[in-house]
Amino acid sequence: MIAMMQIDIGGRAIEYRVIPGPVSERPPLVFLHEGLGCAALWRDFPDKVARDIGVPALVYSRFGYGHSAGLERPRTPRYLHEEALDVLPALLDRLGIAQPLLIGQSDGASIALIHAASGARPVAGIVAMAPHV
């Protein structure tokens, strides 16, 4: 079993795990899970990718998933925007992650695209698997 940590974002806990890697000019990876998933469902895929590329990575569970805090209210049609524009930037700031390569599946891919399209902070790139477009 892979040990997860928790970090406070806006007064609520988010489950996460940092996969260590060498200091590199290459961007760190951030894995964004699908709509019915959580960090644990990525299994060892992030570890293998980070190791093969030689970079650190972040895997986390959004609010309401895995061992992160539950939702405070029912989701609205803008929940992907809230994750992309509020929660993800706060998490990246707290963990000191700048200009990541975002890797998202389904909801996670949509969050990555919305986050990057906002232009609020630079990303190194996006791998978007089955986004809602």
Language-model segments: which ranges?
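Conserved phosphate-coordination/catalytic loops
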Residues: 10, 36, 78-82
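N-terminal cap/lid segment of alpha/beta-hydrolase-fold proteins
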Residues: 1-13
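Conserved HGGG/HGGXW glycine-rich cap/lid loop of the alpha/beta-hydrolase fold
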Residues: 12-70
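Glycine-rich, phosphate-binding/catalytic loops in enzymes
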Residues: 45-50, 74-77, 119-120
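Short, hydrophobic alpha-helix immediately C-terminal to the catalytic nucleophile
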Residues: 43, 89, 113-117
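Conserved hydrolase catalytic core segment
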Residues: 98-133
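Active-site loop/oxyanion-hole signature of alpha/beta-hydrolase fold enzymes
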Residues: 53, 59-101
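Active-site acidic short loop of glycosyltransferases
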Residues: 11, 25, 55, 93-99, ...
